[in-house]
Amino acid sequence: MADPSFDVVSKIDRQEVDNALNQAAKELANRFDFRGTGTRIQWSGEEAITLESETEERCKAAIDVFKEKLIKRGISLKAFDVGEPASSGRVYKVTGKLVQGIAQDVAKKISKKIRDEGPKGVQAQIQGDQLRVSGKKKDDLQTVIQLLKSSDFDVALQFENYR
């Protein structure tokens, strides 16, 4: 029998992000403090979201509304990288990108943390934009999952294919 293993990934459920975007757009259209400010939120390509408003403050408030909806939908804010409002004519625009996948340098940090602080006999292999963690006992893998959940990395981590 093969050793137990699991994958550490950073993925976003695009449908949940779309639901959060639609909820935020509905709230921006109905809220009293956003009336008449021309505040809009929409997709900008596959992995980016654009917010527009007449004032910088309304733009930042719209970002907060969208972040609140992301949290309610169970999406980590580490997966949403938002820039600063930039003026273009009479409108302020902000573009936020959805971050998926674990970068090589972050994967190395995670692997090093597992080697240094994790149980003995647990290995982590970097496989593209994810990590495969394997060990002799399932209890050791549970310990590694708890270790990674308690650590603060710059990406939202999920654990899948636990077998």
Swiss-Prot record:
GO cellular component: cytosol
Keywords: Nucleotide-binding
Classification via CDD domains: YajQ_like
GO MF annotations in UniProt: nucleotide binding
InterPro entries assigned: DUF520, UPF0234-like_C, UPF0234_N, YajQ-like_sf
Transmembrane domains' residue ranges: none
Coiled coil: none
Listed Gene3D superfamilies: 3.30.70.860, YajQ-like, domain 2
PANTHER family reported in the protein's UniProt record: UPF0234 PROTEIN YAJQ (PTHR30476:SF0)
Stated family: Belongs to the YajQ family.
General function of this protein: Nucleotide-binding protein.
The name this protein goes by in its record: Nucleotide-binding protein SACE_6882
Organism of derivation: Saccharopolyspora erythraea (strain ATCC 11635 / DSM 40517 / JCM 4748 / NBRC 13426 / NCIMB 8594 / NRRL 2338)
Lineage: Bacteria, Bacillati, Actinomycetota, Actinomycetes, Pseudonocardiales
